[in-house]
Swiss-Prot record:
Gene3D superfamilies: 3.90.20.10, 3.90.209.20, Hemagglutinin Chain A, Domain 2 (2.10.77.10)
Protein name: Hemagglutinin
Any one GO CC term of the record: host cell plasma membrane
Keyword Nucleotidyltransferase applies: no
Record organism: Influenza A virus (strain A/Chicken/Hong Kong/YU562/2001 H5N1 genotype B)
Location(s), subcellular: Virion membrane; Host apical cell membrane
Source organism, top-level taxon: Viruses
Subunit architecture: Homotrimer of disulfide-linked HA1-HA2.
Any one Pfam family match given in the protein's UniProt record, by short name: Hemagglutinin
Biological process (GO), any one: fusion of virus membrane with host endosome membrane
Membrane topology category: Single-pass type I membrane protein
Primary role: Binds to sialic acid-containing receptors on the cell surface, bringing about the attachment of the virus particle to the cell. This attachment induces virion internalization either through clathrin-dependent endocytosis or through clathrin- and caveolin-independent pathway. Plays a major role in the determination of host range restriction and virulence. Class I viral fusion protein. Responsible for penetration of the virus into the cell cytoplasm by mediating the fusion of the membrane of the endocytosed virus particle with the endosomal membrane.
Cell membrane recorded as keyword: no
Length: 552
């Protein structure tokens, strides 16, 4: 008699996950496990960067801070900073109207500086032949009175005379020195002589690398901050052991303080309206701080610190698990690009919870699920290494800081913006393509592992079992739990069971042959009987026609 068939099936894990990923071939594929690699959240605050506070200029501009706008006194001396924060339109800029020459270049310089030390280079009290305290303006008020920038001195004539100035400062420090000075452009000739006595004046400035001669531009202008005059400010970096020489007979705004560059490093000037949040981060954006190990973010293109790369994507999810198709969903799923299972396993097993791939067996001793730990662990290691590799390759830290251009450089600014947008488009495309390709490969990798497990069993059992076409094998012999375990661990003894399997195969084949013979006899009998009946009917019809004279 036939044995009651024992079976072993190969299958894969399924769960209640609703995580979905995209691949080259499909969109919204539900998977058992996935990992988001796009950071989309921030804390909405300005934070310390690696424990170092930012310099938040509040309502002051960089120019207002460096020149010493009286409304920026809180920044007279500042400690080391990690980055500088300036509002888009700070109220306290150049209180006396005018320009800051090469301002954008100075800001770029500041993006590589972390600390200034302010030092006095020409004391205000040293101008004995000129008025050093009368140079104030209602445009720069302080406590309701006229005042002026704290770090420079507006020199006015004294006793109806403005003697020619010849001053030098030698940088004996070991550090570079940021030196600032300026020129006043009066509204008319009357103001020129009223302030400086001399109708024709100049300012000469020289270092080992600088040769500058300035003359005032006297012109009638509209009033700004109540002033028709204008001031123009300049700066230079004075190297150690170099000297800066000033010569002027009027309109000179002399330096009193300079900035010793005591620490250089990665910094940035960030445009933001946020407040300080008393927090710490490794990555700061104008929108807020990011604390993430993900390789990509879509928060803001400008960052400072150890930051993910900015992309324009809204979703980047890597598949780490398998297609999630529980067995109750009997629909055939599309397969991937790189091979994979030929569709013979209709669904995953939610009952197998301790591995990605495994077995289900049934015999006289019962039935149950068992994960294949070895193939599962290899797959976990492989997928984990791949995800970590992607993150490591993409998570090369860098700063993406904004560049500023003056009004004469708008065409350059537009070109720069187009180039940066182009780079962002390329990065976004690369990131999205990478995710699509890797997801396709991961799902096919899992499918291939299931197929390999199936082949491992098939090669062991050979003709001792029958392939049922659904991922299962039906044994031609009794297979108890010990036998089942040997199939799972690859030690199945084919010769031990081959004789029993052969006999059962032959018995099954004999039943098929016997059944086939019976069907053939019945078929012949039926054919003969039908033929005899037809012959009798034809003969009877002929006799009837003859008796009626109808047959000629």
């Amino acid at each position: 008699s036939l044995v009651k068939s024992d079976q072993i099936c190969i299958g894969y894990h399924a769960n209640n996950s609703t995580e979905q990923v995209d691949t080259i071939m499909e969109k919204n594929v539900t998977v058992t496990h996935a990992q988001d690699i796009l950071e989309k959240t921030h804390n909405g605050k300005l934070c310390d960067l690696d424990g170092v506070k930012p310099l938040i200029l509040r309502d002051c501009s960089v120019a207002g801070w460096l020149l010493g706008n009286p409304m920026c006194d809180e920044f007279i001396n500042v400690p080391e900073w990690s980055y500088i924060v300036e509002k888009a339109s700070p109220a306290n800029d150049l209180c006396y109207p005018g320009d800051f020459n090469d301002y954008e270049e100075l800001k770029h310089l500041l993006s590589r500086i972390n600390h200034f030390e302010k030092i006095q280079i020409i004391p205000k009290s040293s101008w004995s032949n000129h008025e050093a305290s009368s140079g104030v303006s209602s445009a720069c008020p302080y406590l309701g009175k006229s005042s002026f920038f704290r770090n420079v001195v507006w020199l006015i004539k004294k006793n109806s005379a403005y003697p020619t100035i010849k001053r030098s400062y030698n940088n004996t420090n070991q550090e570079d020195l940021l030196v600032l000075w300026g020129i006043h452009h009066p509204n008319d000739a009357a103001e020129q002589t009223k302030l400086y006595q001399n109708p024709t004046t100049y300012i000469s400035v020289g270092t080992s690398t600088l040769n500058q001669r300035l003359v005032p531009k006297i012109a009638t202008r509209s009033k700004v901050n109540g002033q028709s005059g204008r001031m123009e400010f300049f700066w230079t970096i004075l190297k150690p052991n170099d000297a800066i020489n000033f010569e002027s007979n009027g309109n000179f705004i002399a330096p009193e303080y300079a900035y010793k560059i005591v620490k250089k490093g990665d910094s940035a000037i960030m445009k933001s309206e946020l407040e300080y949040g008393n927090c710490n981060t490794k990555c700061q954006t104008p929108m807020g701080a990011i604390n993430s190990s993900m390789p990509f973010h879509n928060i803001h293109p400008l960052t400072i610190g150890e930051c993910p790369k900015y992309v324009k994507s809204n979703r980047l999810v890597l598949a780490t698990g398998l297609r999630n198709t529980p067995q109750r969903e009997r629909r055939r799923k599309k397969r991937g690009l790189f091979g994979a299972i030929a569709g013979f396993i209709e669904g995953g097993w939610q009952g197998m919870v301790d591995g990605w791939y495994g077995y289900h067996h049934s015999n006289e001793q019962g039935s149950g699920y068992a994960a294949d730990k070895e193939s599962t662990q290899k797959a976990i290691d492989g997928v984990t290494n791949k995800v970590n590799s992607i993150i490591d390759k993409m998570n090369t830290q860098f700063e993406a800081v904004g560049r500023e251009f003056n009004n004469l450089e708008r065409r350059i600014e537009n070109l720069n913006k187009k180039m940066e947008d182009g780079f962002l488009d390329v990065w976004t495309y690369n990131a999205e393509l990478l995710v699509l390709m890797e997801n396709e490969r991961t799902l096919d990798f899992h499918d291939s592992n299931v197929k390999n497990l199936y082949d491992k069993v098939r090669l062991q059992l050979r003709d001792n079992a029958k392939e049922l076409g659904n991922g299962c094998f039906e044994f031609y012999h009794k297979c108890d739990n010990e036998c089942m375990e040997s199939v799972k661990n690859g030690t199945y003894d084919y010769p031990q069971y081959s004789e029993e399997a052969r006999l059962n195969r032959e018995e099954i084949s004999g039943v098929k042959l016997e059944s086939m013979g019976t069907y053939q006899i019945l078929s012949i009998y039926s054919t003969v009987a039908s033929s005899l009946t037809l012959a009798i009917m034809v003969a009877g019809l002929s006799l009837w026609m003859c008796s009626n004279g109808s047959l000629q």
